[in-house]
Amino acid sequence: MRKERLEKGSWLGMLITLGVVYGDIGTSPLYVMNALINDAGPLKNATPDYVIGSVSLIFWTLMLITTVKYVLVALRADNHHEGGIFALYALVRHRAKWLIFVALIGGAALLADGTLTPAVTVTSAVEGLKGLPDLRAFSQYSWLVPLSVTLILVSLFTIQVLGTAVVGRSFGPMMLLWFIVIGGIGLLNISQAPAILRAFSPVYAIQVLFSPTNKMGIFILGSVFLATTGAEALYSDMGHVGKANIDATWPFVYAMLILNYLGQGAWMLTHSQGPAWRNVTNINPFYEMIPSGGRIAMIVLATVAAIIASQALITGSYTLVDEAVGLKFLPRMIIKHPSNVRSQIYIGAINWLLCLVTLSIVWLFQTSAHMEAAYGLAITLTMLMTTILLSQWVQMKGHRFWSLALLAGFGLLETLFLVASLTKFIHGGYLTLGLTLMIFLIMVVWFFGNRRRLRYNQADEQISLLNYRSQLIQLSQDDNQPLFATNLVYLAKVDQLHRVKRSILYSILDKRPKRAKVYWFITINETNRPYDCSYSVDMLGTRNVVEVRLNLGFRKSQHINRYLRAIVTSLIADHSIDPQYSNYGITQPRQVGDFKFVVQNQQIMDLAGNPTMHQFDRFLIGGRIFLQNITPSPAIWYGLEFSDVLEETIPLFTKPMTDPALVHLAKRQTTRHQV
């Protein structure tokens, strides 16, 4: 589907949006009211005031946070049609240096807490099988639920390689059916207890926070917040489906969700004081309000919807990581584009890492009740960080008053949710906070490690090829040096002033000189056009020192050896470089010689070579080098696995250094003798 149609909105775009964006927030009714009942204890404690107040809290939480903050405000803060906390940070980062920590905390928390989303939603749906008499085994054998969830999640993560559009088209109709069904069931139950409609009044929401029937007090907000954890996905997935499609579909989704929450509340009002229900604990009104004849069909539909809920998290994670790589918060990864829309991506490393962590959580907690107790803590941090960045964006647009109002209003509200969610820490929230800290440290080390490295050698980091042309020409013609390669290729990122990293020329000239007939310095630019494939050449006034700028579309193969061979053939044909005849080869005559690609790596132990470096800088720079060495090599990014590649270890600092503490002892002795 074309990006332009996604941005303008269409029926197909809205269907894809239902399948991609709303899975998380759309399946919250599976577990939110269950969590609120667990907070109350036995069902008899869920008095009418408690039930109406709880549903009112859900209604106004969805209204204020999801509708007002995200749909009405955040979706307007798009960065070239992309959303998410990192895209927002890129818009406002020039306003203050400290904002980078806001973005890093928010992004890390979103990635960490998202690992619980697939686990809790799919487990909640599958647990519905426990209530079926014909499937008593799910109650008798506790391992059957996590095993079933594992099989479902592995299948989901496996199909991600097909792309967002394919997955969205498949899931969209199912989510449309899901929302219609849960809204309809909710409406049927509302008719049995119309008093639940009083939940539309915010008075009941405020009263329940301080009511003696609410044993949790303000900490009830920790369970209420589960209703809106998927709100951040609306913003993160904007680049996948377009703002117009989210604007068009959210009113429908919101209405269906509220009808279902009201229906669950109505069922609780009707049954909470009944003899058969008074002392029941850990009951899920979502399934109980469904007629027994439709229970099996609803469990199947809920399981499908729970699978789709995981989709919103997965696509959002891809976008978040892609933006983090672009901002140099994370190492470069292999990113695939299954469609012609650039923002629709697939990152295999993230996909399977997310799968591994999610499955670990499933087997660690095993029940949805345990997962709900841990779910939502880290995401409150993300929402609070998004609010801070949004206030900066509103102020940047010239609305200082509204900026302060947004920061004060939503900042206070989300701080309350954060405080209320702190009780989750001992119940498993420590896991997501631990993941948040780990991801945050990785991003800090990668970003600031590079900044500190550049600080130490920035003055001499870039040197001009023009100043070394004569040496390269002379080396190329020096028969006293063995021929290293016919074509020696460096992936160099040459700037407009013909400057490259000092380490590249150090590799050619300062180490054992690498004689080649032609030296190639390749700069690769990824363009917004999916199948772009063009190049420009600068011979630098020579016949054997060549700059090449290769422009490749984001869907175009990046196997640069194929393109380079065609470029060499073209330059030989127009007599820009000499033919590279060879007497050996399967095909003859052969005019293009061999290629040698050089990939440079650095080692942590090289940090000892700079005695003036601070210890904290050693940690940051060393950490970055370590991360760089365990991530995929450029040889893999550019399809050079089967080419002749030299992976070369180079010094971190190629400029010669001296230790100011070094003393010439002979000179001191002579001076002492003279005295």
From Swiss-Prot:
Membrane topology, from the record: Multi-pass membrane protein
Segments passing through the bilayer: 12-32, 55-75, 98-118, 143-163, 170-190, 216-236, 249-269, 296-316, 345-365, 374-394, 401-421, 428-448
Upper classification of the organism: Bacteria, Bacillati, Bacillota, Bacilli, Lactobacillales
Function text: Transport of potassium into the cell. Likely operates as a K(+):H(+) symporter.
Source organism per UniProt: Levilactobacillus brevis (strain ATCC 367 / BCRC 12310 / CIP 105137 / JCM 1170 / LMG 11437 / NCIMB 947 / NCTC 947) (Lactobacillus brevis)
InterPro entries linked: K+_transporter, K_trans_C, K_trans_N, Kup
Molecular function in Gene Ontology: potassium ion transmembrane transporter activity; symporter activity
Compartmental location: Cell membrane
Protein name: Probable potassium transport system protein Kup
Keywords: Cell membrane, Ion transport, Membrane, Potassium, Potassium transport, Symport, Transmembrane, Transmembrane helix, Transport
